[in-house]
């Protein structure tokens, strides 16, 4: 009986979106309280179909200027590749050991602080990133957008928030946070979900 009222007693009554970085692409899980808004088995890669630049790149199966075509690791790497070198982008080149396939949003922002050639790409990426976040923010009436798995530092967060505030105001900017859930909770979160859903809500094992 300890968990009968788990949802009422422990879940915060707010909508949130968990946006996470997964091997070079984006995934999103909208949540209301402590429960996912979308049904189990829904495609969490829907976020990659969001348009962040109507005049942007085309990719088969996606709208013009989609997240996939503009913000994926492969897409951003394509913008950097023409000048990626030990001479022009020394910080990024060293961080990635000369391998652009290892690019992440965090490594781009960190390197752009010293590699001046990267700054236009970094600025454009942040702006388009904020368009994606704002779409999710409005679509799900989210009180928070949690960024998970990106490797962002608090300084990176402030950089993103500054661009977000210029784009859509301070309230939106402050809704963007670094997800407090650490990697050690991956297994525990799964156990919690199974116990809550399978036993407390359904009265037995999940089918």
Protein language model annotation of sequence segments:
Residues 7-11, 67-207:
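ATP-binding/phosphotransfer module of carbohydrate and carboxylate kinases, centering on a glycine-rich
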């Amino acid at each position: 009986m300890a968990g009968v009222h788990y949802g009422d007693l422990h879940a915060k009554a707010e909508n949130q979106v968990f946006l996470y970085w997964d091997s070079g692409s984006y995934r999103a899980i909208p949540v209301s309280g402590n429960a996912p808004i979308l049904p189990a088995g829904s495609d969490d890669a829907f976020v990659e179909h969001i348009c962040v630049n109507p005049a942007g790149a085309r990719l088969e199966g996606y709208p013009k200027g989609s997240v996939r075509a503009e913000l994926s690791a492969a897409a951003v790497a394509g913008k950097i590749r023409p000048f990626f070198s030990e001479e022009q982008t020394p910080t990024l080149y060293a961080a990635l050991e000369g391998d652009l396939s290892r690019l992440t949003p965090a490594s781009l922002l960190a390197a752009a602080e010293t590699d001046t050639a990267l700054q236009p790409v970094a600025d454009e990426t942040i702006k388009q990133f904020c368009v994606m976040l704002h779409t999710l923010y409005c679509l799900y009436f989210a009180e928070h957008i949690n960024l998970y798995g990106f490797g962002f530092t608090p300084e990176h967060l402030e950089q993103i928030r500054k661009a977000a505030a210029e784009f859509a105001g301070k309230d939106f900017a402050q809704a963007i946070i670094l997800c407090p859930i650490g990697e050690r909770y991956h297994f525990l979160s799964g156990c919690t979900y199974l116990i809550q859903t399978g036993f407390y809500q359904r009265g037995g094992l999940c089918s």
